[in-house]
């Protein structure tokens, strides 16, 4: 049998295959037949759209093919024929159909619309549905676009550790990694667990961010980025939080907060435009069935400049807007999703950088501003989501950094290597973190993070 042609190739290079005998392999999405002929919609995973296969009773196995259950896998040999009068641009007139694998008749994804809640219970099968085939194709293309954006600008891709002995965010919401017996762990004299007897000789956790390690490489290679899994033990059962997710974290040396925001804006626009160019069928599907204003919004983001406002100005806008919020607004609070969405969706009506946050609600490594109250930090807020990027200029002054750590009761011994970076040719540098899943939610219009992760990990859920 000849080598299979991808359905994607048939759609992208149709003229190369018209009126020729070809072979395709894929899974049956739909099948309808009569006594003399039938139609099969086949998808091979390479393209969002199916291809129609027409077969008739000249096939030796016509009756067997006519009764095949949905999701059975087949190979088809036939002629690709143009169908200008039909919905589809072409079809295959089958000469031979080979059954590769039969599906059971109780296959749960029949031809009807299923709720996302139900599809989460069959996460091992949901990539075969239209919505999730589109979602995970976009996820793949967006991941490639991120690498391409940074590689084209000579950034060094850096792999930071997943197991770490430090807490980058200082929040303490981390998953512990240990080989100690939980029933009978070795104890210190004060009765606490003696982690010196653990595998790594100290308390270790799954990383919440690769940023501190990334700074080491930025101060050697100038411009670097990380792209990998991170973990947060936050018991937040919301549509925006997951215990395991992916982060993109660039770090740039000889750069300040303004440079950081410029990089973030350029990267976001590049990735969105790349996905729009490479996944038009998928985005059209999302625009039709998930978020009817999606394409208009994405085009607006790509073509417009992002707004900028200080945290203090944002608080004043929220206090004067006359809108009743569930969470009161006052200077010093951490902005909630409802505040962020008001700013981006109702006031500015575009993506928005909020800068210069109070130091008390931000991490220890962010550069202290001259006012002594705020830090050179920024969050990028986008309509429909809220915060999607968090970044800052890093504190390069050793004495100021130590003072901040003392304020927050962080041990210098735990961060000795990070502090040492400030001794040997320190310079201003900056970076940000982008939650990859939130980016995919924004590009697709999907509203629940569980639906943009192949196998979501959330409180109480570790199935599959």
From Swiss-Prot:
PROSITE patterns: AA_TRNA_LIGASE_II (PS50862). Belongs to the class-II aminoacyl-tRNA synthetase family. The keyword Magnesium does not apply. One of its GO terms (molecular function) is transferase activity. CDD domains: AsxRS_core, EcAsnRS_like_N. It catalyses: tRNA(Asn) + L-asparagine + ATP = L-asparaginyl-tRNA(Asn) + AMP + diphosphate + H(+). It is found in: Cytoplasm. The gene is asnS. GO terms for cellular component: cytoplasm. Pfam families: tRNA-synt_2, tRNA_anti-codon. This is Asparagine--tRNA ligase. Gene3D superfamilies: Bira Bifunctional Protein, Domain 2, Nucleic acid-binding proteins.
